Amino acid sequence: RSGTSSITPSSLGASSSPRTYSSNSYNVIESIDFAALASGTNDETLKNTDQYLATVIPTRKNNYTGLLKDYNLITICAESFCPWFISEELTPTLYKMTHTGIIFENYYGTFQSVTTNGEYTMCMGLYPDMSRTKTDSSFNVAGTNYLPFCLGNALKKKGYQTWAYHDYIGDFYNRNITHANMGYTFQAADSGLDIK
């Protein structure tokens, strides 16, 4: 919030005392009093957002829950890729995937758009630490962090085989370390990936 010197539970409308979560409670957002936040601001955008969030009932299910059970999951991170080049004649597999799968169209590169930051966001579902440099990226740190909730580890825990591939050398951006730590069997051009 603008003008707030520090963020505390009470500044977000929540109790400052510790909260015990039930097995059905998985989101800290449940402890935020959005109605109180809405009444405490004159900013119409914040007020409308808070009023909307006050009406949302947290749930573990949505329209996609279970829809793709027992299907394979393939994610493609293609830097500088233009969807105009997906055609039935030139790229039949990509064409089929884009017409029968789920595509996230509102995916944008991060500020200081370097490869490692976009790849980090896709793999982790988090924003990268923008204070880091290209050679000291968030991905480098991800090689040693505990990452049970990133996609590869989460799927592996559910019994999936998880693979990641890159058509360049494996130690570039430390992918040979980070991708293994994220739960993938990783292959690159210099480590097992046969590029023809």
Placement of each model-derived feature along the sequence:
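N-terminal secretory/membrane-targeting segments
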Residues: 1-71, 87-91, 98-99, 104-106, ...
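His/Cys-centered metal/cofactor-coordination and adjacent catalytic loops
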Residues: 68, 82-157
